[in-house]
Amino acid sequence: MENKGRESYEILLAVCKADHLQLTIGYKQMRDLLERLCRLHMHNGSLQMTDLSARISFVAAKVGLSVAEQNRLHTFRLTSNAILNRQQEPTREHLLRDAKTLAFFIRKLFEEDIPQELYRLLPRTDATYIVAPPAHKQVQRMRVCFQYSDERYLYVTPLDEIADEPLRVRYNIPQINEEFAETCQLLWRHAQLNLLDVAVDEAGTLTPSFIVLEPDYLIDISSLAECYRDYGHHPANYFLSRLQPIENARPLLLGNIANLFLDEWIHAEGEVDYLKCMQKAFRRYPIELAACADLRDREKERQFFDDCKLHFDHIRETVNDTFHAAGYELDKTDAVLEPSYICEALGLQGRLDYMQRDMSSFIEMKSGKADEYAIRGKVEPKENNKVQMLLYQAVLQYSMGMDHRKVKAYLLYTRYPLLYPSRPSWAMVRRVIDLRNRIVADEYGIQLRNSLEYTAQKLEEIKASVLNERGLSGRFWETYLRPSIDNFQEKLKSLSTLEKSYFYALYNFITKELYTSKSGDVDYEGRTGAASLWLSTLAEKCESGEIIYDLRIKENHAADEHKSHLLL
């Protein structure tokens, strides 16, 4: 440890002696030094904190830094963010101020005096920082670090500004954020939160509409929506889907072929030949078609290809007729197929089937059945499909700045066909994000504890008595819904003690790997995981070879049927 302290002082001394042209490089070296120091003092902990702000808060609590000392470190963090993102020009005055902050931090960590040569270069006055005054305003998004809570408030520290004391966040407020009551019971110290649509009163108290736990851990929208089942929407549904094999590949295969049909009709200038489309489907999905057990039965095979023709005709009718009908006004010549979205604000990712280029309208296509029984004589969208549409509307608002009230969202059930307009419900979106938070908390707990007993306890929740939140009974529940849930527990209970231990250990390992692949790993220098896309600065991406920029497309052959390619 003594060598670490001496090496750290030597780095600071070299930075302070560098000339004016090296200020940005100096900030990069000091930033890397702070990252290493925080990781060094978190090495024995299992906390999965990939954000520097959270690491500073953790180490500060561990070594007993005062609020003023913490704020000086956060001031350096924010200044280095701005400089490394090319939003601010570095000055020697600020560099020496921040070098002094790091020097005193090193002294605290290693209990080793600052060398005289370095001390003489540091400013005599204490490092100062600016505390943003509270204002009566509305903030769209704030990233904060959770510290503790009481019956009325969550106490958090902001990541993008400096505060003398934790900010207060009002929670469980009726008609505003009461949907996140369960989320707030699951928080742990230093957890990262995104607060969305935040009202700030004159006392500086925050009242957010959304509370998103660990937003760097992205959950797939379709997987989250599938948690909404006929019998309830418990978080364990997410883990049940992950652990269940696909028993019937036929609906999935039909959906893929229907997407191919949509692609053909959108890009077609005239009529599309059905047989040529099916030949293309066979070329694209040869193994899936050959391996599908249902298609080995002659009657089911005939029904499958009859369904393909039905969906083909319905998609043609929708694209050629319904698109141009009054009230829809969809233009296939100005559309994007299968655009993908990453929404750090909500901790979600997903892919749409069809979207107008100006994002004014989008379509999510379903080849399965809608709800034919909720209202007699009327076809209604299923709850999981409505949830999926709501989440896409929320993603467009918080990622692309599109007001959800101005975006037309449609569900296309190609079986009927039915192009159903989706109506936004922000209270429902809040409930779904609360469910997402509970899933993330479960994932975090499993990878943090890495305990066979804890994992066994969590997987024990995957049973009919827990998942059947609506208390269904009768023939439909017993014949069609319950067996798939019971089947998992029966298989688990049939394992020997050794087999169970192996399964739980492997499950823990995969969960840990999945968590680090998304949020990153504190054991490595630099940023890792998918979250580095928005957490890393441009300079960090360039240095690690993760980005090539200033490229121009010379020839675009991406839509070519054979050997699609781009020339840059």
Go through the PLM ranges and name each one.
Residues 28, 32, 253, 257, ...:
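Short amphipathic alpha-helical face segments that pack within enzyme cores
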Residues 1-122:
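Amphipathic alpha-helical interface elements
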Residues 142-145, 168-170, 174-293:
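Charged, glycine-rich intrinsically disordered N-terminal tails and low-complexity linkers that flank
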